[in-house]
Amino acid sequence: MRIGLIIASYGRPGLVRQLLSSIETQDRLPDEIVLSVVSEEDLGGGSLSGLEVNIIYSSPGSCAQRNKGLVFLQDRVDIVLFIDDDFWMSRTYIKELEQIFLTHEDVVAVTGLVLADGATTSGISVAEAERYLEGYELAPAPAIKIRDVPDTYGCNMAFRASKIRDLKFDERLPLYGWQEDVDFSAQLRGRGRIIATNLLCGVHLGTKKGKISGVRFGYSQVINPLYIFRKGNMSLRRASFLIFKNIVANAAKSAFPEEYIDRWGRLKGNMIGLLHVAKGKLDPMYALKL
């Protein structure tokens, strides 16, 4: 099977170089690597990697950049793998991914185990990620776990290419595209199994550089789930839970916020979002005006 890897990146040239170097250590290399960026500034100077990398340019935004990658790959591959530009894969990740799709013909999407997720903390350094992975690979192999899930986690998710040729990420979810992974993979329900497995694993650094403003993200925390619900790709219960959880967290922690989270900004964005909901306005693109 031919495997295509798509990486969308913005404002992190140094990190991208480190990521590509880590990909060189994979037991099984991807057949195509697509790096979707906004400008040459996202690449830095000099050679990127010893790997052959297809560089494409896109308007900014996770969804737009990933869609550009999908258009580029088209019929070139059998599996499309997306990873964030701060996701470090275990050495066997791509090799195991190929075997999953070969041996489970009913699987259309798969997401791997995140050993540590810096998105929920102040972040994880590359050195720390490598230590996590080294420890995992040296430890006795755990029991294999494969379970059906409703959707994939955007930092590492792969799809059977033949099942997504008519799909695209919704570019009305701008910037970081919060919940775009749920929205995209929900379109695959009825086409086959969506699974999560510890056969694939990695570390999500959760790098804070290049993230959007607190106000914009707070707005998206309210509007995006309801917008996706209205499309039929998220239950009202889940959308409501996400909104409630985030508003409570932002309000509770705004007095003594974490250094790496703009709680006041997020809370302000939440309030603007709630006001728009009360007015019957569900436009994720409004975040660009904040």
Where are these regions (language model features)?
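Short, acidic, metal-binding catalytic loop of nucleotide-sugar glycosyltransferases
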Residues: 21-30
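Short, flexible, basic/aromatic active-site loop/helix in glycosyltransferases
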Residues: 112, 129-149
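Non-catalytic, C-terminal membrane-associated alpha-helical segments of glycosyltransferases
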Residues: 215-224, 235-290
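Active-site donor/metal-binding and catalytic loop motifs
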Residues: 193, 197-215, 224-228
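A short, conserved alpha-helix in the catalytic core of glycosyltransferases
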Residues: 151-159, 163-167, 174-200
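Active-site nucleotide-sugar/metal-binding loop of Leloir-type enzymes
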Residues: 63-79
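Short beta-strand-to-loop acidic/aromatic patch adjacent to the donor-nucleotide binding site
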Residues: 77-88
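Conserved donor NDP-sugar-binding/catalytic core segment of glycosyltransferases
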Residues: 92-126
